[in-house]
Design a protein with these regions (language model features):
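Non-catalytic substrate-recognition and accessory regions of acyl/acetyltransferase enzymes
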Residues: 1-184, 277-301
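Charge-rich, low-complexity amphipathic helices
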Residues: 113, 228-229, 260-265
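Generic alpha-helix signal with a bias toward terminal, lower-confidence helices
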Residues: 58, 154, 179-181, 206, ...
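Acyl-donor binding region in acyl/amide transferases
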Residues: 150, 159-249
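Charge-rich, low-complexity intrinsically disordered segments
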Residues: 246-301
């Protein structure tokens, strides 16, 4: 096992001049030592070519996240190793090296769509940084005035039943304080809630890369449930929103499954007073879908 690489990974993520962070670094190194064969397997994966080496150097969290109880409740070492490698293999298979270089080697964001609200820029961007590593290997973030408003952390995987590419969502995060902003933005998008707009953006991305199904963690499946007492509840209720998005609980009750396509009511199903609003909303959604597809296609192999 290459000690220099592990030192680089650990010291990139932990501020070792702070005692608490130094303790975390020591625990990280201890975990790596205890599971040296598994860590060696991952290091060999990254050492396979210069591009992967650059990803690890630019995004050391890709190694560290396999050593901790991240992604979903009850994840094992073997599952996490497979998860990270499969995500990167699928990304390699789908996209030109330029995209991977931006996201992982350089830590840059990749814009998929833009609009405006209140004459200020609103964008949808792919992004990965260390603060997201607990819940995924990539995120889709809605930025307003350059600051993240909503984020969906996720990873790409192979469906266990048919081997097709799927998306797994580890978390959806929104603003702590921003009710007035969200209300205004919802009105500007013709009654379409910002959270739904965010998820629709992921659905557009999924469609653009040929993914038919999206899985998302339930409340019980959220990674933090590894550490939450049985008698306590999470502050975030994932389940209600996933059900609203046509989510159905899986046999593995840690996850919901949802279709990539969002159901749209026909004009005949809507009240006459709502039809004009929905036409404008659907037009906005179609603009987003086309923009995301064009952006993704520009990076696809």
């Amino acid at each position: 096992m290459e000690k220099n690489i592990l030192e680089y990974v650990g010291k990139s993520l932990y501020k070792t001049h702070i005692l608490k962070e130094m303790k975390r670094y020591v625990v990280f190194r201890a975990r790596c030592a205890m599971h040296s064969s598994k860590v060696d397997e991952l290091l060999q994966f990254f050492a396979a070519n210069s591009k992967r080496q650059a990803w690890l150097q630019g995004a050391p969290a890709l190694l560290e996240q396999t050593t901790r109880a991240f992604f979903y409740k009850g994840s094992t070492w073997d599952e996490r190793l497979e998860l990270v490698q499969n995500h990167l293999l699928i990304m390699e298979e789908l996209f030109k090296p330029e995209l991977m270089d931006k996201l992982y080697s350089k830590g840059e964001r990749v814009q998929l769509w833009e609009d405006s609200y209140d004459d200020r820029l609103l964008t949808l961007q792919l992004w990965f940084h260390a603060g997201q590593r607990k819940e995924g290997c990539l995120s889709l973030a809605l930025f307003y005035e350059g600051e993240p408003l909503y984020q969906i952390m996720f990873w790409l995987a192979k469906n266990k039943t048919d081997g097709k590419n799927v998306i797994y969502i580890g978390a959806l995060q929104g603003p702590q304080n921003g009710n007035e902003l969200i209300k205004g933005m919802t009105k500007a998008f013709f009654g379409y809630r910002t959270k739904n707009l965010m998820f629709y953006g992921l659905r557009c991305f999924a469609k653009a890369i040929g993914v038919e199904n999206i899985f998302a963690v339930t409340n019980d499946g959220y990674y933090a449930m590894n550490h939450v007492r049985v008698d306590r509840k999470l502050k975030t209720d994932f389940g209600a929103f996933w059900q609203e998005c046509e989510g159905v609980i899986c046999s593995d009750r840690r996850f919901y499954i949802m279709p990539t396509a969002e159901h749209r009511k026909s004009m005949e199903e809507l009240k006459p007073s709502k039809r004009a609003q929905h036409r404008r909303r659907f037009a906005k959604m179609d603009e987003m879908k086309a923009a995301v597809k064009a952006a993704v296609d520009s990076y696809k192999k």
